[in-house]
Amino acid sequence: MKKSPTNWFKFSLSLVIFLLVRLIPFRPPNIEPILAAQMPLAGVYGARAGFLFGVLSILFYDIFTQTLGPWSILTAGAYGLLGLGAAFYLRNKKSIRSYVGFAIMGTIFFDAVTMLTGPLFFNQPLLLALTGQISFTALHLLGNISFAVFLSPVIYSLLAPDKNPKITQAVSLINPKII
């Protein structure tokens, strides 16, 4: 990430906003906009910013909610890897279709990693973890795809308004006054 005060401000503001969104009570735990924010951040600011956003999003939330533990390291690492992947995958692809594609791949990667390691942490039978993971992943995919369609382009247009006309056009369809 370039050392511009504006870039660091936008990055930090994104962390705070999405931490507050995750703190909304009574929301499903797997419907959260971390990946939707991480994709445009990684695409605009690069792999380091994508990695840091993923890791810090998980760690700050777990510290704030006093749930920090071994599981935090695993999920933070998985989200960090998603940030690296997003930076490379979205390097020359900045369309809603690209966001949706990465949201699908990223969600399946994240859920597979956490599902396969969950039994190691909690002495849970693998079949039980797999069975419970199906509905969790279905909701997770639904949330991440929806956020990739509606939220990621808006975030991208706020981070880099002049870089991609496809994204800006999609945002202007949602809110014509943005043009």
Task: State the predicted function of each range.
Residues 18-33, 56-89:
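Interfacial aromatic-anchored transmembrane helix boundaries in multi-pass membrane proteins
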Residues 17, 21-22, 53, 57, ...:
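Alpha-helical transmembrane segments of multipass membrane proteins
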Residues 73, 94-179:
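Membrane-embedded alpha-helical hairpins and interfacial helices in multi-pass inner-membrane proteins
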Residues 21-25, 45-52, 84-100, 139:
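Hydrophobic alpha-helical transmembrane segments
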Residues 1-44, 48-52:
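Hydrophobic transmembrane alpha-helices
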Residues 25-26, 46, 65-69, 90-91, ...:
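Short helix-capping/hinge motifs at transmembrane helix termini and TM-loop junctions
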Residues 2-5, 39, 88-99, 161-162:
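Membrane-interface helix-boundary motifs at transmembrane edges
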